Amino acid sequence: MPRARKGNTPRKGGQRRGGGARSSAQADSGSSEDEAASEARSTTSECPSLLSTTAEDSLGGDTVDEQGPQEDLEEKLKEYVDGLTDKSAKTRQGALESLRLALASRLLPDFLLERRFTLADALEKCLKKGKGEEQALAAAVLGLLCVQLGPGPKGEELFHSLQPLLLSVLSDSTASPAARLHCASALGLGCYVAAADVQDLVSCLACLEGVFSRSCGTGSSTSHVAPASLHGVCCAALQAWALLLTICPSAHISHILDRQLPRLPQLLSSESVNLRIAAGETIALLFELARDLEEDFVYEDMEALCSTLRTLATDSNKYRAKADRRRQRSTFRAVLHYVEGGECEEETVRFGLEVLYVDSWARHRVYTSFKEALGSGLHHHLQNNELLRDIFGLGPVLVLDATALKACKISRFEKHLYNAAAFKARTKARSRVRDKRADIL
């Protein structure tokens, strides 16, 4: 796997801290503004999400009981794998969905290694002969398989065998938007985790760039308005492309900057709030990569870009949904802050007894990609998946017995005191910038 520029100088504001894990006796609490900003930094697609179902949903209404015997779990997983080759499209979709939920919420490397050829053949048929939702689910399962198998020879072999199909569906303008969207995401995630060599990376980058350039008109001199049905495809291709930029060799980065940095601002005027946000975050990432290559990097059209970013950061149009306005303003304030001043806001992610710091745009793109793929299972994978712990610099998996866990756990009363103190400090900080009626009078 062409892992992300590890031999280079650490990224400013990004990997110098590595994301390291540390014990935390504090409760996972924070201000509502921080939560809103964190929510705003996570862009979702406009097609129906495959992560909308809870992790308890399963084939035939059964549940994957995390506390149940391992034998029962494997029996259910075998049923799901067998269901992938059923004659009924509805049964195949149910099996794919159940398998996807299991892969997102559990670590199953041994089970998957034994059946990787069976799974590869079944997913190939689903991508070739399936339609719409079935292709979308198959692509999502493939991405999760790469996360489970990791960057070794087995994962590389799986991705390399199905990469041409992902490229084919993604480039097919007659395929359903949902299928193309999830093929784009799977292509980005699979290539990030299991690309065999740099040539695979370059070919995936070229395909993804071609999709969002053709769909949204960023590669043409004339303005081109993409239909609403393609906004999700465009957004997913752009985000997958940005993910792969974080592991792209410096020699290729400079050419990409020259080609795409002047074009991407066109997407800031899109009708889709998700596409605008994805474009803004990608622009910030390109600035970060450019400043890594050249410390005194100067963008020629800086004034016009900052003006557009400032407008989006203060947008108050009433015809937009309130949640969309809040998400857009929060994101573009952070983008503008980085483009103008070079400082990236830090996001703190607590899981179990550990803490992950997301303090660069490259790190944010990687974290968001895994978050969208794994959904509610992200924290489980951060704690136990060696691949994710290596990517985010979390070190070996923590092994804690029941006594250690009990010693680290704080009581409900202590948690209440901590939250009360945080609330009081937050109120004082906010009161300084609020209008006072007495001052106005």
UniProtKB/Swiss-Prot annotation:
Q: What are the protein's GO molecular function terms?
A: ribosome binding; translation repressor activity
Q: Which SUPFAM superfamilies is this protein grouped with?
A: ARM repeat
For region Disordered, the annotated ranges are 1-72
> Is Nucleus given among the entry's keywords?
no
Which keywords does this chain's UniProt record carry?
Translation regulation
Return one Gene Ontology term, BP aspect: negative regulation of translation
InterPro entries per the UniProt record, alphabetical? ARM-like, ARM-type_fold, IFRD, Interferon-rel_develop_reg_C, Interferon-rel_develop_reg_N
Composition bias (Acidic residues) maps to: 63-72
Which ranges are annotated Basic residues under compositional bias?
Answer: 1-15
Q: Mind telling me which Pfam families this protein's record contains?
A: IFRD, IFRD_C
Membership in a protein family: Belongs to the IFRD family.
Q: How does it assemble?
A: Associates with ribosomes; promoting ribosome inactivation.
Describe its function.
Ribosome-binding protein that acts as an inhibitor of mRNA translation by promoting ribosome inactivation. Associates with the P- and E-sites of the ribosome and inserts a C-terminal helix into the mRNA exit channel to preclude translation.
Kindly provide the name given to this protein in its UniProt entry: Interferon-related developmental regulator 2
Q: Which organism is it from?
A: Oryctolagus cuniculus (Rabbit)
